[in-house]
Design a protein with these regions (language model features):
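Positively charged n-region of N-terminal signal peptides that target proteins for export
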Residues: 1-5
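Ser/Thr-rich, low-complexity intrinsically disordered terminal regions
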Residues: 19-145
């Protein structure tokens, strides 16, 4: 693939994401404990809070949760999901979205195991898949509008 095409593809893949250096509102999700069974990240996007919320909802659904809740919150748009791991173990995922000063939105996600000390990277991989699915949903939304 010619270098200019590769650059165009990479630009298109990262277009919905705002540079991380720009400030994000304070993270409304709980901190992770000092154990390696939790992942908590924040990302900035150019999309409106409503568009990002819809993309996050589709992304969570695509990962096959046991349950997906949409709690009412005036401070931040929130989603909560439970995923089953192995036979009996459950992991909790929380998502919050806030408007950023100057436009765009901040997306916060926290994925944590309910029990155990280590999750062997399960929550990190889930967050990575979730963020990838959010990017895909945003690209799909922008191509249909």
């Amino acid at each position: 693939m010619p270098p200019f095409r590769l650059g165009a593809v990479l630009l298109a893949l990262t277009l919905p994401i705002v540079a991380e250096a720009q400030s994000l509102p304070d993270n409304p999700l709980s901190d992770c404990p000092d154990t390696p069974n939790c992942e908590r990240v924040a990302r900035g996007y150019e999309a409106s809070p409503d568009t990002l919320y819809a993309a996050a909802e589709r992304a969570l659904e695509s990962l096959g949760p046991v349950t997906l809740r949409r709690p009412d919150s005036s401070a931040a748009r929130r989603l909560e999901a439970v995923y089953r791991v192995a036979l009996l173990f459950k992991d909790d995922v929380a998502v919050a979205i806030r408007a950023r000063d100057g436009g765009g939105s901040a997306l916060y996600v926290r994925s944590a195991s309910r029990v155990g000390h280590s999750d062997l990277g399960v929550n990190r991989r889930r967050v990575d898949r979730f963020l990838e699915a959010v990017g895909t949903a945003l690209r799909d939304a922008s191509s249909t509008s």
